[in-house]
Structure formats: C-alpha cells, structure tokens
C-alpha cells in the first residue's frame, strides 16, 4: 500500500476551522464582558438584599418572635389571675392594662406584676383591691430587693391581719421602708415577723405602726425576723390570759395592762408602767418579774423594749405613722443607677412586646386554628394517606437543595463563561497538538489495516477475539432487555397515574380559578402558548447543539482519561482502543469486514465532523451567546438535562403517591378555599385604603425624583470640576495667607507680650486694692438674691403646681380623642401605603435604574477628576515646597531672636509682678493685724465687763436663792430638806456630822466658775442663814403631829422600816414598829426607848453598852401615794445612816 497516499488522504485542512475558532473567541470575549456587567449588578443587588435582610428583616422577625413568646407568657399568667380572682373579661382587661403600665414605668416587668396580682388573688383580694394594692406592692418589692412574689405575700398578710383597706398598701410599704431605714429590721425581716405577730397584735388593739416600731427596736438588739415576731406574740398572748403567778407579780409591781373598759392599753404605756415599777428593783428581781409576766422565751425582746423606754417607742411609732412617701423615695434612691435604669428599660421593652403580641394575636389564633385542623385531618387519615403525606413532604423538602444546586451550577457557569476569554489562546495553542494526534491516529489505523490484511497470524488473533466480545455483549444485552421492558411497563403505569392525578388536580384548580373569573381553558391555552414559543425559539439551537455534543462525547472521554492521570502516548492509545472496540461492537460484524467498516465510518465521521465544525461553529457560537444572555446566568445549556432528570424523579414520585393524592388534594383545597374566601372578602378594602395613602404620600416624590437625581448629579459634577480646576490657586493662596499671618505675628510679638504684662499687672493691682469692697459687695448681692428667692419661692411652687395640674387635666381630658386620632391616622397611613404600592415599586425601579446608570456613567468622570485633583495637589505642593521651607526657616530664626531679646524684659516684668504682689500683701497684713488687734481689745473689754457682771450676778443669785428658801421654810418639809442639803456645811456643824456632802459637790460642779467669786464672798452669810434655817425647822417640827392614812400604807412603811432596821449595827437595839406607830401622835419619837426627853442631849455611849440613841421629831405628813411612802422611808433610813456615821459607826449599805 502507498503510505504517502494514505497520509495525504488523511491530512485535515483545519484552516477554516481555525478561523471559525478565532471568531468564536471574539464572540466569547464580548459575551464575557456583558456577563461581567450582569454579574456585577447581580452581586450588588445580592449584597443589598443581604444587608437589608441582616439589618432589618432578621431583627424585626426576631423581635416579633420574642414578642410572641413574652406576650404568650404574660397572657398565661393573666389567665391564672383571672381564674383565681374570678374576674370578668372587662376586669381582666383593666388588670392587663395596669400590669403593662406598671411594667413600663417601674423596674419590674409586666409578668412580675401579674405574679404579684396572682398572690393577692390567692389571699382573697377582689379585682379592685388587687389593682389598688399593686403600686404599694411594687414599691415594697423595690425597697426589699426585687422579689415581687414575696412582697405581695407580705403585703397581703399585713393588710388582712390589721384589717386595713387595699388602698392602704402604699402606707404599709412606707411603714416597712421607714422601719428599714431607721432600724436594723430589713423589709424581709419585718415581713417575716408580721406573719407571726400581726393577727395577735391587731386583736389586742395594737396598730400596725406600733407593732412595726416594736419589731424595729428588737431588731436593733439583734432579735430579728421570725424570732422578733414569736417573741412579741408570746408576750402579748400571756398578757391576754394571765396566770395566778402573773397576777401576783402585777400586784407586787403595781401595774395593770388593761383600762377600766377591759381594753389593753397601748404598748408604750405598758413599757412605761414596767419601767417605773422596776426602777428600784435589782436585776434579779426585774428579770424574775418579766419572766413571770412574759415567759422565758420573750424575756430578751421585752428587756430590749424596756431598755429603749416608752419615749423611743413612741417616737418611732409617730415616725411610722407619718411615713407616707418613704417607700417611693427610697425606691427612687435605690434605683437611681444604670443597672436599675437598664432593668426599667427591659420592663418597658417587655410591655412593648406584649402590646405587639396583642396586635398579632387574632391573626396568630386563626393561623394556629387552621394548622390545628390540618394536623387533626392528618391524624384522622388512613395509614396509607399518612405515608403519602410524609413522602410528599420529603419531596418538597428536597426542592430547596435542588434549587441550591441549580443556583450553584448557574453561578459556576457564569464564572466559566468569564474564564473562556482567557482560555481562548490556550485552545488555539492546542489546535496543532490535536492535528498531530489525528495524524498519528490515521497512521495507526493504516498500520492496523496493513497488518490485518497482510499478516494471517494477526488476522486470526483478531478474529479469535470476536466470539468473546460478542458473548460478553450478548450476555449484557440479554440481562438488560427484560429490565428495560419492566421499566417501560412501570413508566406506562406511572403515566396513567399521573394522568389521573392531573385530572383530579385540574378539576380542583379549575374550580378555584373560576372564583377569580378565570377558566382552566384560558389558563391552559396561555401556558401552552408560552411553552410553545419557548420551545420554538430553543428547538433549532438545541438540535444543533445536540449534534455537536453527540460527536464530541468520545473525544471528551478520551482526553478525560488523560486528565485523570493516564497521560502521554499510553493514555491516548488506551482511549483510542476503547473507541475502536466500541465502534467495532456497534457494527455487529466481528470479522475483517467489521474492522474495515469501522475505519471507513471513522474516516467519514472525522470528515463530517470537520465539515460540520467549519460550517456551523459561527452559528453555534452566535446562538449560544444569545441564549446565555437571555437565560439567567447562562444556564440554558444545562437546563434541558436538569429538567429532564428532575421530571423523571417527579414522575416516579407522583406515580407512587397518586393513589392517595386525591384525598389529600381535596382536604388541602378545602383549607385553601376557606383561607382564600376570607382573604378575598377583606382584600379589596385593604388594597383600596393602602393605595390611597401611598398615592398621597409618594406621588409627588416619585414624580420629582428623576429630576432631583439628574440635578444633583449635574451639581456634583460641576463642583468637582470647579474644585479640580481651582485647587492649585487655592493651595497657593492659602500658603501665602498663612505665611503673612506668621510673619506679622513674629514682628509684633514683643509688643503683644508687653501689653499683656501691663494688662495683667493692672488687673492684679486693682484686685489687691479693691478686694475688700468686692467681697462685701459680693456678699450683699448673694444675700439679696437669697432673700428674693425665699420671698418668691412660695409663689413659684404654687405656680408650678398649677401648671402641672392644668397640663395633666388637659391631657387626661383629651386622652380618648388623642388615641382615636392616632388610630385613624395609622389606618389612613396604611391605606395610602397600599394604594401607592404599584407606583412606589415602579418609582423605586426607575430610581434604581437611574442611579445605576448615573453611577456607571459617572465613574469614568469621577476617576478622571480624582486623577486631575491628585496631579494638581502634587504640582501645587512641589511648586510651593521651596517657599514653604524658606519661610519656615525665616520664621523660626525670627522667633528665636525675638524670644532671646525679650527674655530680659520677661524676667524684669516677672520680678516687678512678684514685688508688687508681696508689697500689696504686706500693706494688707498691717491693716489686717490692726483690725484683729482692735477686735481682740473689744472682745477682751466685753468679756472683762461681763465677768464682773457675772460675779455680781452670782452673789445676788445666791443671796436671793437663800432668802427665798428662808421665807419658804415653814411651808414644806421637802423644801427644808433640800435647802439643808444645799447648805450642808452649816448643817453638819449644827448636827455634828463630819462626812463630805455629795450633793454639795454636784451643785458646785454644775454651778460653774462664774459663781465662784460670788459664793466666796457670801460664805459667812450662807452659814448664818443655814443655822437659822435649821433652828427654824427644828422648832417647827416640834409642834407638828404625824397623820398617816391607813389605806395600806402602814404595811408598806412597815416593810421598808424592817429592811432599814436589819441594816442597823448590833450595838443598837432594834425598835419595834408598833412603838413607832404609837409614837406617831407625839411630837417626840423615841425610837430606841432611851427615856430621854431632851432632844438636844448629847448622844454618847452608856456604861451598860445599851447603844446610842437617835431622836427624830416628825411633823404632820400627808401621804398621797406609794411614792410618798417610799420617799419618807428612805429619808428616815438615810438620816439614821448619817447619824450613825457621825458617831463613827460603820453602816453597811
């Protein structure tokens, strides 16, 4: 065979193919440019959509979800309140409004307020009582630390226990708050104590304030909470039913806790009686009586009240009575910080969320009801129907991922399309390689044909392979044909089921469309016409594309193997061998004729392919470009295959579920019909109102917006152009102005500094000279301002109250009208918005297109202007750099020289300033010293004169004091005794007593140094007057008889006297009390039976050691109560002790 002829015949002239590829490359570049613009616009819109979604849509959806959650919790809580309180719908509405309002205005949320309402309702409060008590409950919660539930419980128990009205809840909170502020009892401690003692205290007549004051005093002593409550409860309970021991103890103490009407006296009076009755008792005696009266467990608390005394208890009670406003004030103080304000803001947000939930609740209720019905229908379906619904849901769920994959494919195709323009040269470079490969392939084919024809051994080997290949393909075909038959039958059934499903859906959809005035025929005709037009436009192009793709499949497969790793001649040989075997099997003749036919077909195929590419490649590129531009993101080439695959999947699924789909479709259509009917009935009104409002609001804006945009762009362009042109001149002028200012400042700096120094010195001198008048005038002005403010303040307060009252009355009186107007305005706005929606969308599109076009058109100008601006700036700086450096150097040099020359003047001026300042201060010091000296002299003279007056006043005061007492000696024994103690030095000389007087020592201490001189001058007169007073008292008592009332006093005197007698020394006889009684009518009382009638007889020890004697003369004594008896007994006892001490006897206390 002639190999040269074979090679010449197999050589392919690819010049036409190359030219067509060059044309396709230019078309691809133009397509890439257009796609790039579209891709940029799409990216911008995508970014805008993402930004709006992230910044607006998602936060609003999140807030709506949170609002629904918060609102549902609040509604559930209020339903509990309604159920417990038995509230009607109208009462529930009022309570909801109050809870929302309290949540917005306080640091507590509306839900917390609702929980407080629940606790009050559980305590038996009615709706009106709950609403009256809630502000006080929240005030108490704010003071106690924020637990609304505990505060409401404490409030309810306190109000009920003391029989208070619910509107007194605020006062209860004020009492708790004031007690917490003034004592160690926190509000939680007070609430805990009230749980135990409040009912008992109220039943015994104690008020809330007095009980709280008692608990507070106990808390100061460390008795808090439940311990204080049980202590006070135990004490009051024992008093309510006293035992015999308690009655005896009360009789011994002389106390009574009930009045004549059988009512318990206030607690402060009880404390007063106990404090007086136990004043003279020892600690053991007092504790014994208190334990008897109040019990062992209440001893500590009652001791705390006794130690505090009735005055502190009464003061605390009055403070709690007048404590209105304390809780609010304390709560405001405690919440005056950022954390509390944030909590209050959270409460306000929750109130807003509840309002939003209330607005959405009707629509949400309908949606939930519809979903519930759908779920109930699903539950009631047959098992087969339920399975079909699940399958259909899975299909719908898969639609999203499929669309996602499709979108990714579209995006990838766009990116590949952009990359085509860069692959063009590479494809052109590979054309030579492809031509060489084709030539090698032809050579191999020629060699194979020669070997098969000339070599019998090779031909026999090839022929022996034919049966094996045929057997293999035959077995595969025998297995495949039954499967394809089964698949065809299955697809036929699927088609029938799909037809039935389509008829069912079509009938239902037809009925639905008829409600809107649309027939299924019209809809089908329109859809069919649309699909037909699309297929007609795409049919020819896809036909040609399909022919090209079918030819290129084998080549793509061969080069794919090489791309996967089988590279070089071996990979190409393997791919060619696979293609050859496939073509040979396709002929069905596994012999030499088949091989010859393969090569003939291959030759014809290559020639046909080359002709096809040369002829149709330009048309293919043009049509492909048009399709990629018109169909989004160039997916047209992949859409048919994707649609075919998806259609097959959907057909298979539809065939499976078609048996149960009619029932499901019927149920779904019924639900949809109900929803659409409701929407259709209300939709015209909504649309009409919305369109009117939107039209009114945005019509003018839409009409004027294009003009505004165009004018704005023109103005901006003109400004930029003008700025670019004038920038060099502006920079040069600015530099010149700055240099001129700096140079002028340097030249005039000495004069400026000198003038400043003169001004400062003048101000200092004037200030030093006039500091006194300035201060005096300032004080006068300040006093005048204060006096004027004080005079006007009541009027200002009155006017402010009137203004606030008038403003509140006006707001409250017009609140319904304001709310109604707001609602109408909101509805009108929504109606206009809906009416204007089409125009708004159209206007928005126009604006977007205009902005996009303006941006695209203006970018080159903006870049050009920026370049010109940068050039001008660089040129201006370069041209002025030299002058700037020169001017800066000159300015620095001049500034340094001027400062150096002015240093001397500055030092001199500073020295003068300091010198003048010191001189001024020195002159002022002399004046100040003079003033202080004169002031001291005046003070000393005043004090000296006043000292003389004090001495004189002291003498006169003592003289008058003694004269007054002397004149009143005969009127009262008590006055005589006090006067005798005041002049104790004279009395002890008269009676022969030598012990010091404590009373005189105290009187000397408290009289003061001012009386020292006067007392020194009056010592002799005082001694004479004291002797005269003692003699007068003795003479007066000798003529007086004792008169003691017999109403139980004698027994008291006897008890005290016996105690006194037990303290006498053993050397003295113990006088009998009956002797004392018998001697009561005698002016002389011989207590020790000495037999002496002379009261002035010296008292000395007798020879038989019978003891000393004491003579006491007692006049008439009027006993008014037990205190007088105590004073008389103690006076006798003390006088006896003094007498015995005067004789040197040791008297035990």
From Swiss-Prot:
It is found in: Host membrane; Virion. Gene3D superfamilies: Leucine-rich Repeat Variant. GO terms for biological process: viral tail assembly. Residues 1084-1109 are annotated as: Disordered. It holds the Pfam family PhageMin_Tail. One of its GO terms (cellular component) is membrane. Its main location: host cell. Keywords: Host membrane, Membrane, Transmembrane, Transmembrane helix, Viral release from host cell, Viral tail assembly, Virion. Residues 1094-1106 have a biased composition (Low complexity). The chain crosses the membrane at residues 389-409, 431-451, 561-581, 689-709, 726-746, 781-801, 840-860, 865-885. It is a multi-pass membrane protein. InterPro entries: ARM-like, ARM-type_fold, Phage_tape_meas. Plays a role in virion tail formation. The length of the tape measure protein is proportional to the length of the phage's tail. This is Tape measure protein. It comes from Pneumococcus phage Dp-1 (Bacteriophage Dp-1). The gene is TMP.
């Amino acid at each position: 065979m002639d190999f040269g002829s074979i090679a010449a015949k197999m050589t392919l002239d690819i010049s036409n193919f190359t030219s067509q590829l060059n044309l396709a490359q230019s078309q691809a570049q133009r397509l890439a440019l257009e796609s790039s613009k579209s891709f940029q616009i799409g990216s911008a819109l995508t970014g805008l959509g993402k930004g709006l979604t992230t910044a607006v849509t998602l936060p609003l959806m999140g807030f709506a979800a949170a609002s629904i959650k918060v609102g549902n919790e609040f509604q559930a809580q209020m339903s509990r309140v309604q159920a417990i309180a038995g509230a009607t719908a109208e009462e529930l509405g009022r309570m909801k409004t109050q809870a929302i309002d309290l949540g917005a205005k306080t640091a507590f949320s509306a839900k917390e307020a609702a929980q407080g309402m629940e606790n009050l309702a559980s305590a038996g409060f009615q709706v009106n009582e709950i609403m009256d008590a809630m502000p006080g409950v929240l005030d108490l919660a704010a003071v106690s630390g924020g637990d609304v539930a505990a505060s409401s419980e404490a409030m309810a128990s306190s109000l009920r226990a003391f029989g208070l009205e619910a509107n007194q809840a605020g006062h209860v909170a004020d009492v708790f708050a004031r007690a917490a502020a003034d004592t160690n009892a926190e509000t939680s401690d007070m609430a805990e104590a009230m749980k135990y003692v409040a009912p008992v205290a109220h039943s015994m007549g104690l008020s809330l304030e007095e009980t709280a004051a008692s608990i507070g005093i106990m808390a100061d002593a460390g008795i808090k909470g439940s311990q204080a409550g049980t202590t006070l409860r135990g004490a009051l309970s024992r008093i309510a039913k006293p035992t015999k021991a308690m009655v005896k103890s009360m009789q011994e103490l002389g106390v009574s806790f009930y009045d004549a009407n059988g009512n318990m006296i206030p607690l402060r009076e009880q404390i007063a009686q106990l404090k007086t009755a136990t004043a003279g008792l020892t600690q053991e005696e007092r504790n014994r009586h208190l334990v008897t009266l109040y019990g062992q467990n209440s001893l500590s608390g009652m001791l705390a009240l006794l130690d505090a005394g009735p005055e502190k208890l009464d003061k605390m009670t009055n403070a709690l009575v007048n404590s209105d406003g304390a809780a609010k004030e304390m709560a405001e103080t405690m919440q005056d910080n950022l954390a509390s304000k944030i909590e209050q803001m959270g409460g306000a947000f929750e109130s807003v969320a509840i309002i939003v939930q209330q607005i959405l609740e009707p629509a949400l209720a309908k949606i939930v009801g519809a979903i519930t019905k759908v779920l109930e229908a699903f539950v009631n379906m047959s098992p087969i129907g339920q399975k079909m619904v699940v399958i259909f849901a899975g299909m719908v769920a898969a639609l999203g991922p499929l669309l996602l994959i499709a979108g990714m494919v579209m995006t990838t195709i766009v990116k590949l399309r952009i990359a085509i323009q860069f692959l063009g040269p590479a494809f052109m470079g590979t054309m030579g390689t492809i031509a060489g490969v084709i030539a090698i392939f032809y050579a191999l084919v020629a060699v194979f044909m020669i070997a098969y024809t000339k070599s019998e051994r090779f031909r026999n080997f090839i022929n022996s392979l034919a049966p094996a290949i045929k057997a293999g393909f035959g077995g595969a075909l025998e297995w495949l044909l039954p499967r394809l038959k089964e698949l065809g039958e299955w697809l036929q059934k699927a088609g029938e089921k799909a037809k039935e499903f389509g008829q069912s859906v079509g009938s239902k959809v037809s009925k639905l469309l008829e409600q809107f005035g649309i027939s299924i025929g019209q809809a089908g005709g329109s859809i069919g016409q649309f699909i037909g037009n699309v297929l007609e436009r795409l049919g020819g192009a896809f036909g040609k594309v399909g022919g090209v793709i079918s030819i290129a499949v084998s080549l793509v497969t061969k080069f794919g193997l090489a791309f996967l790793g089988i590279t070089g001649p071996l990979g190409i040989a393997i791919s060619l061998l696979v293609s050859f075997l496939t073509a040979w099997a396709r002929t069905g003749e596994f012999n030499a004729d088949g091989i010859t036919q393969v090569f003939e077909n291959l030759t014809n195929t290559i020639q046909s392919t080359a002709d096809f590419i040369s002829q149709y490649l330009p048309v293919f590129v043009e049509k492909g470009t048009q399709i990629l531009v018109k169909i989004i993101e160039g997916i047209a080439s992949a859409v048919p295959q994707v649609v075919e695959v998806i259609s097959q999947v959907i057909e298979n699924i539809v065939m499976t579920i078609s048996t149960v789909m009619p029932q499901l479709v019927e149920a779904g259509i019924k639900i949809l019909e109900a929803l659409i009917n409701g929407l259709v009935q209300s939709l015209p009104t909504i649309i009409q109102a919305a369109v009117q409002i939107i039209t009114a609001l945005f019509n003018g804006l839409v009409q004027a917006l294009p003009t505004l945009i165009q004018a704005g762009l023109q103005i901006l362009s003109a400004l930029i152009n003008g700025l670019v042109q004038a920038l060099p001149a502006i920079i040069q002028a600015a530099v010149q102005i700055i240099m001129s200012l700096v140079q002028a400042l340097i030249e005039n700096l000495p004069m400026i500094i000198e003038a400043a120094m003169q001004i400062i010195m003048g101000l200092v001198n004037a200030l030093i000279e006039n500091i006194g008048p300035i201060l005096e005038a300032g004080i006068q002005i300040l006093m005048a301002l204060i006096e004027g403010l004080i005079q006007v303040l009541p009027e200002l307060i009155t006017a402010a109250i009137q203004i606030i009252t008038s403003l509140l009355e006006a707001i409250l009186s017009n609140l319904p009208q304001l709310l109604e107007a707001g609602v109408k305005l909101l509805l009108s706005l929504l109606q206009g918005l809906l009416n204007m929606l089409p125009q708004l969308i159209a206007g928005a599109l126009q604006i977007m297109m205009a902005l996009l076009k303006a941006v695209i058109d203006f970018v080159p100008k903006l870049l050009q202007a920026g370049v010109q601006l940068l050039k001008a700036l660089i040129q201006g700086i370069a041209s002025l750099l030299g002058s700037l450096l020169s001017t800066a150097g000159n300015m620095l040099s001049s500034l340094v020289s001027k400062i150096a020359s002015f240093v001397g003047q500055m030092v001199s001026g500073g020295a003068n300033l300091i010198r003048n300042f010191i001189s001024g201060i020195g002159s002022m010091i002399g004046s100040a010293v003079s003033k202080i000296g004169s002031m001291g002299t005046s003070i000393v003279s005043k004090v000296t004169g006043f000292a003389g007056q004090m001495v004189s006043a002291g003498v006169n005061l003592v003289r008058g004091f003694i004269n007054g007492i002397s004149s009143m000696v005969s009127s009262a024994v008590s006055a005589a005794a006090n006067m005798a103690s005041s002049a104790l030095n004279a009395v002890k000389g008269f009676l022969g007593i030598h012990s010091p007087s404590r009373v005189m020592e105290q009187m000397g201490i408290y009289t003061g140094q001012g009386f020292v001189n006067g007392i020194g001058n009056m010592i002799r007169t005082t001694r004479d007057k004291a002797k005269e007073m003692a003699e007068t008292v003795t003479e007066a008592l000798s003529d007086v008889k004792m008169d003691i009332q017999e109403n139980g006093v004698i027994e008291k005197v006897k008890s005290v006297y016996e105690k006194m007698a037990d303290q006498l020394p053993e050397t003295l006889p113990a006088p009998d009390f009956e002797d004392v009684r018998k001697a009561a009518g005698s002016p002389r009382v011989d207590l020790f039976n000495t037999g002496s009638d002379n009261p002035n007889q010296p008292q000395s020890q007798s020879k038989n050691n019978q003891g000393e004697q004491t003579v006491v003369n007692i006049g008439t004594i009027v006993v008014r109560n037990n205190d007088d008896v105590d004073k008389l007994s103690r006076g006798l006892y003390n006088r006896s002790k003094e007498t015995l001490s005067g004789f040197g006897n040791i008297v035990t206390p």
